[in-house]
Structures are given as structure tokens and as C-alpha cells.
Amino acid sequence: VNERLPKSEILRGRKLISWAFKNSKTLYSDEFVILRVCPYGERKVLFAVERKVKGAVKRNRIKRLLREFYRKNKDKFQVGIWIFIGREALLRIKSHEINFPLIIPDKGGEG
């Protein structure tokens, strides 16, 4: 299993990001929100933090945890655009405990 996160996999470009937000399906959790756009030719991912989270240290820690979660579970995500928005509740969890099998859709279906 390739657990790397190459730069080519990071979603970039203002137009593409705003298009992804408009055409996405949303999955909610207490710790983060996942937005996904499935019909896209390659796997792209974006990591963000809610605006409510104050302090650069907290925001950076949340993004680090999200990247780690994605890297470790990369094979469970379909090809498409994935946007992870972290919430402050994520800081209360240890990095090795972040695992949400209930909200990760299987590779075969739409949901």
C-alpha cells in the first residue's frame, strides 16, 4: 500500500476548488466534514480547517492529523475529489485513534 501524499495529489486552483465545493456530496462527523466529488479523472485531495478554530498552532495540528488520516486510509477512498474540513473536536483525539469506517464509502458504490 502506497501511503505517500505526492504534491500532484493536492487539489489546487481557485476555480477547481470552488467547482468542487458546489458539486460535492457531504459526509459529517463530530471531528471533521468530508466533501466528495466522484466523477473526476484522478484522486485529488484538499485539507482545510473551520474558521471557528482560532490559533495557527491548532489549525496546523488539525491539518496534520487530517493528512495523516488520509495517508493511512488512502486505499479506501475512490478516485475523485475529496475535501476534508477539520473541526476543533479533532484535537481531543490521538492520531492513531482517528478511524471512521462508518463514513468512508466503499470503492464500489455511490455512498
Enumerate the predicted regions with their spans.
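Positively charged, solvent-exposed patches that mediate nucleic-acid binding
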Residues: 1-111
